């Protein structure tokens, strides 16, 4: 089987699972679980435009579930409350992945 097809199938399954457990995983006090969720979202953002859109959908789903005003509130709240440098790094990496994966963004250096 083509490696790209396997990756696509894997990502589809990950997305389905991610949407099912996303809200409960981020409501836990276990930062290891939350760290893994943000690492998965980062990987989705960088992998493809569809993955980027799915990561934003997951944040939007969480926002609606928690009746928040902004979809990135969870990321900023976690960043402010993070106690370890490792977790802060994962959160900042996720923000970076969102920025570099934005289709309309053109950065000139």
Task: Locate each region found by the language model.
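Elongated alpha-helical scaffolds that mediate protein-protein interactions in large eukaryotic proteins
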Residues: 1-69, 84-89, 100-109
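Amphipathic alpha-helical repeat scaffolds
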Residues: 23, 76-80
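Charged, helical or coil segments that form electrostatic protein-protein
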Residues: 67-77
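Conserved C-terminal subdomain of P-loop nucleotide-binding cores
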Residues: 95-96
């Amino acid at each position: 089987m083509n490696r790209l097809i396997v990756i696509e199938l894997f990502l589809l399954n990950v997305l389905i699972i991610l949407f099912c457990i996303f809200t409960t995983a981020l409501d836990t006090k276990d930062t290891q679980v939350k760290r893994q969720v943000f690492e998965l979202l980062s990987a989705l953002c960088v992998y493809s435009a569809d993955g980027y859109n799915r990561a934003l959908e997951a944040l939007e789903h969480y926002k609606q579930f928690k009746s928040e005003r902004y979809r990135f509130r969870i990321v900023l709240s976690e960043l402010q409350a993070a106690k370890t440098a490792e977790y802060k790094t994962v959160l900042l990496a996720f923000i970076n992945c969102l920025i570099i994966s934005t289709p309309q963004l053109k950065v000139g250096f």
